[in-house]
Amino acid sequence: MKYFQLNPECYLITGAHRSLIHNLLTGKILWLDANNTKQILLAEAGNEVNENESTFTELEKLGWGFFSDSKYFVDKLRSTNIYNETKIWKNSPNLFFATIQLNTECNSNCSFCNNIFCPICIKNSYKTIMDKDMFFELINGCIFYGLKEVLLTGGEPLLHPNICEICSYIEDRNISLSIKTNGLIKPINFPQDTKFIILLDNFNDFDKIISNYKGYKNVTILTNKRNDNLALSRLPEGWAVQFFATNLIISKETMKGTNLDEFFLKKLNNPCLFSKLTVLSDGSVVPCLQNKKQIIGNVKNDEFSQIIKKLSLDYWSKPIGERKFGKCKKCEFKYACNSCIFADCDKLCSYDVEAGQWK
């Protein structure tokens, strides 16, 4: 009989009946059945185990754990200070990323418009536009909290009458700039290092988009069309392609391992919302564009510090896996999953937590 322990970089996450081991150095995961889970829990609790038991010998072969003749404490690898997790007075919140909707007007009619999960833009027949002075004041408020990057969206942000002045204001403050666009308007006098995210719905516009943006290198085509590889093969050098699904899919195939930082971001915070701000064209602050009806405040009327405080307490620091309802709470995949706090995972997820099986 010997003792067995998982390596410092290996974390065991238990579910209702099964468990998952995360290796934070390799980014790999290992799914354990109920019996193996029971064996590992006994070992991790400091009990002696049979050194010939396959549960442990296989993990030793993988280099994920080790045997020892005596019991001793293994300090787990972590990216955070334990003191910060338990102290009463928390650190001041940091705001790293802001999504700002400049307008709701758009010169395109995407087939999935306003009918997509986690949209990057929102078109509205009730046209609103963000005043440039309000935008400048908003950016100044964000800079105080450490703003690093801004995503401008709409509608179609290039239709904003002050778009060039707005972009220059961001560039002058050494803030990384990304612009979501449909690619139908040629950008003129934009900073060369601007990141353009072109939402492509119709390949009939493909040649026009290339012509409009061929002078820029930092361009990503965002599309849900996976069947036109011939067109995509003609992209200018340096351009990237990213595919998206119009609906949230939670399946065995979408589960993935995490590295050290990703694991603790998911464990301690909401990775989708953490240190991020989303402001609509009328000044309303929302958690994200997916949940635009949940108004947190308005930058025109409310103290910006109070908005940041509410975001930090009510959204940034609320891990998805720690929700007090639904099956996420007792699921071993909660840190390997792409689930959303605003989605009904009980309906959208194909994993049966109680049975320990994917449907």
Q: Where in the sequence are the language-model features?
A:
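Conserved alpha-helical substructure of the radical SAM core
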Residues: 38, 54, 58, 62-66, ...
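Short cysteine clusters
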Residues: 106, 110-113, 272, 288, ...
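Radical SAM enzyme [4Fe-4S]-AdoMet core and its adjacent flexible, acidic
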Residues: 176, 188-302, 307
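Flexible mid-to-C-terminal extensions adjoining Fe-S/redox cofactors in radical SAM and related proteins
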Residues: 7-8, 295-359
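Acidic, low-complexity/disordered tracts enriched in E/D and polar residues
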Residues: 1-42
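Short beta-strand(s) of the beta-wing in winged-helix/HTH DNA-binding folds
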Residues: 66-67, 338
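Short helix-coil junctions and helix-kink-helix linkers
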Residues: 40-51
